[in-house]
Design a protein with these regions (language model features):
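A structural motif corresponding to the C-terminal end of an alpha-helix
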Residues: 30, 76, 82, 122-123, ...
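Short histidine/acidic/glycine/proline-rich micro-motifs that form metal-
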Residues: 10-13, 85, 134-138, 172-175
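Active-site donor-binding loop signature of nucleotide-sugar glycosyltransferases
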Residues: 39, 132, 170-172
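Glycine-rich phosphate/pyrophosphate-binding loop and the adjoining helix
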Residues: 138-142, 146-193
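Short, glycine-/small-residue-rich phosphate/pyrophosphate-handling segment
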Residues: 109-157
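Short beta-strands and strand-loop turn motifs
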Residues: 6-7, 130-131, 169
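Short, structured loop/turn "capping" segments at alpha-beta junctions
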Residues: 104-109, 161-165
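N-terminal beta1-alpha1-beta2 submodule of the flavodoxin-like/Rossmannoid cofactor-binding fold
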Residues: 1-106, 179, 183-193
Length: 193
């Protein structure tokens, strides 16, 4: 299985980085071919300008700065996203990766006369999100869990029709104990093995 792990956190020593490392190790231990895309470490540019947004713009696969990211996405059978949830969703760096790479011609194509896109990432069979929240699960449920909906209702439908999605979350991160963080790392490891 070829797995693309996408990590988005600006601090190399963060708990998110520990989750990233745990995920990569667990996936490799089961024999996956893991491609780690650390958006901050690779200095990904999340800025989508007006020219790139234009319908006349060449697709992302034809842009020298985005082509390698498109290739990595197209190689993957499985996606694992690791990031903190800030203000209800992923960091802007991750959202910029979606905006610039998951574009028409790569992730979907428009269907004439329809509002529904046609999926183009049919090789992707699963998406797993590993995230942390500063707030409680209850607060996130009341807010409608926009980050979770982004993955389960939007990204997943651009993948294989039977693609699975999993959401591994540590809530109340700002108040967790070392034992709670260790237990979450263990949960991540066991889920991905």
């Amino acid at each position: 299985m070829r797995t693309l792990v996408v990590h988005a956190h600006p601090v190399a020593t963060s708990f998110s980085a520990a989750l990233r490392d745990c995920a990569v190790e667990a996936l490799r231990s089961r024999g996956d071919d893991v491609d780690l895309l650390d958006l901050y470490a690779e200095d990904f540019d999340p800025y989508l300008d007006a020219d790139e947004w234009s319908p006349d713009s060449p697709g992302a696969e034809h842009r020298p700065d985005m082509g390698p990211y498109v290739t990595r996405l197209r190689r993957a059978d499985r996606l694992v996203f690791v990031y903190p949830t800030w203000f209800g969703g992923p960091p802007a760096m991750f959202k910029g990766w979606l905006d610039r790479v998951w574009v028409q011609g790569v992730a979907f194509e428009k269907v004439p006369g329809s509002n529904r896109p046609r999926a183009r990432l049919l090789h992707i069979r699963s998406i797993t999100v590993i995230t942390t929240y500063g707030s409680s699960r209850w607060v996130n449920v009341v807010e409608g869990e926009p980050g979770k909906r982004l993955v389960k209702r939007w990204l997943r439908v651009l993948c294989h029709p039977l693609a699975r999605s999993r959401w591994l979350a540590l809530y109340g991160m700002d108040r967790t104990t070392a034992a709670a963080r260790a237990a979450f790392l263990d949960r991540v490891e066991q889920t991905l093995k």
